[in-house]
Amino acid sequence: MASFKGFSANTVPVSKTRKDTSSLTATPGLRAPSMSSPVDMAQSREFLTKAIEHGSMSIPYQHVNVPKVDRKVVSLVVRPFSAGAFSISGVISPAHAYLLECLPQLEQAMAFVASPEAFQASDVAKRFTIKPGMSLQDAITAFINFVSAMLKMTVTRQNFDVIIAEIERLASSGVVNRTEEAKVADEELMLFGLDHRAPQQIDVSEPVGISRAVEIQTTNNVHLAPGLGNIDPEIYNEGRFMFMQHKPLAADQSYFTTETADYFKIYPTYDEHDGRMVDQKQSGLILCTKDEVLAEQTIFKLDVPDDKTVHLLDRDDDHVVARFTRVFIEDVAPSHHAAQRSNQRSLLDDLYANTQVVSVTPSALRWVIKHGVSDGIVNRKNVKICVGFDPLYTLATSNGLSLCSILMDEKLSVLNSACKMTLRSLLKTHRDLDLHRAFQRVISQSYASLMCYYHPSRKLAYGELLFMSSQSDTVDGIKLQLDASRQCHECPLLQQKIVELEKHLIVQKSASSDPTPVALQPLLSQLRELSSEVTRLQMDLSRTQAINTRLEADVKSAQSCSLDMYLKHHTCINSHVKEDELMDAVRIAPDVRQELMLKRKATRQEWWERIARETSTTFQSKIDELTLMNGKQAHEISELRDSVTNYEKQVAELVSTITQNQTTYQQELQALVAKNIELDALNQRQAKSVRITSSLLSATPIDAVDGASDLIDFSVPADEL
């Protein structure tokens, strides 16, 4: 018998090989069949009935493995119209348990969702495409989002057939025939038992079977997805965190390609080739409050053509660098919260169905938490949330990042019980004013120097833009710290100015009548640059020295005017060595420190003696009172001891008397017993000596007893009636 590439001649259908599960276990997405024998419930009930009828209480116990029907592992085969079929498997959540009743219809629907070309390559259809490697629950989520976005319908058991019909009608104009490669993939799935249809056996002993096996093995587009294959939760959450900070390229682009592409079509982006901000055409979505000022959260000009539209304009030529649709959180969050409770569709669901990237302002996050309607706002699988709408504002201030992160972790009901103090600290710190003031200092910088932070590759150039420093000459101590690692090619405007200045310098040199040799001109140029640099450094040094002089004067003035006066009039008893070190740290003179320490020691001794006297006076009366009470208690104890001794003597006398009486009574008892024995013997002797004979009896005849005839014989029954 011939064999080829793992297909043996004795290959049998999978349905007949229930005991051999080694190959099935290794197959991705297929669960091994249970080895426990099935239980015949009818036979068990019959056996139990007979045992009860015959009076037998000995019923054998049989262990039955009951599967959890609510978490059943389901395997489906998705057959796209222009690609190879693949298998997905997993558990269906209890919320979607009704899908277990309509698995064939679900497979049919997923085939459409996995074929976006059937809908004329719609962007919405591409966004929710079911792909190989998805888990079953992710595929169901993609299907539900597809129905929500394309059909504006909610998936339920009642309208499932209607949804299938609508999808077929919508795709009727774009459906293509399945390719030959897709059919080959179906055969491979059936071979490994992953298809719901009957498995087909390939007989490799025949030339046709061998060619069929070769065709299956060499097919390129066949993909068997792992049943439980899914995006790593750590990669997914890391990607969400990067989008939240406006760093989309820092996310894993093998999973977030479409979201990243949409991001750079919406948000301000710098084009280094044109040397200007890109004129964006696609509109994004902003969730904000009605009373917040959006102009304080961006470095661009803000244009509001109407109540629902916001444009960000370039500060140089006023072209549009970003377009947004403004939605007030007060109008959509409460209705969305109510719709979630009644299992209905809300306006926010419709808005989220048409976009992948949404901006939420920090004020909107605080509003939904304060009013208890935050569930389902930021924690959505098909939407990536960005805090704020200007990347520079979010990365400079980090305002709202902590609130958004904690809302992505848990529902508000859990946070109010487990993280209540954390929420309180995030909501009541009132840092918005300080952050807005800090961001105004960023805006005051050169507009051209800030453009590099809107470059798509900013994931490697972004550092902390703002940091706090406690300096004496500034209240907030906020400085702009540009990342020194960015390259000059990120600042083309500066490069252009440098080229123009070099050209201008060459023209000036050629026009001047400087007799300096050409070889020395570069050295002189460097010398001039060094001279200007030295001049600048000298100016900085002078400025720093002036600041230091002013600070020293302030310290001396504060020391002489306030600290010395305080130490002179302050009464303190702390004479520890650490106090001397602290006064030395604030620059107190040594003689003053010694005088203060001696004064404190004397004051401490004085107070110690005073407290000792007051304490002894206060407690002397209590000590006398306790001594008197102690004497009284000792006298009472002595009296009690005497009375106890008397009682013991009386008890001893009573015991002696009782003992004597007991001895006397025993002697008398013994005498009585002896007397009794003696009398008994005498009585017996007298009885033996006296004999009753017939001569002693009377010869008089016995007379009848009077009234003997009237006696009733009770042995004879009589009728009492």
Curated annotation (Swiss-Prot):
Coiled-coil regions listed: 523-556, 632-686
Region called Interaction with mu-2, residue ranges: 14-40
Region: RNA-binding, residue numbers: 1-38
Presence of the UniProt keyword Plastid in the record: no
Alphabetical keyword list: Coiled coil, Host cytoplasm, RNA-binding
Entry remark concerning the domains of this protein: The C-terminus is involved in the formation of factory-like inclusions.
This protein's name: Protein mu-NS
Gene name of this polypeptide: M3
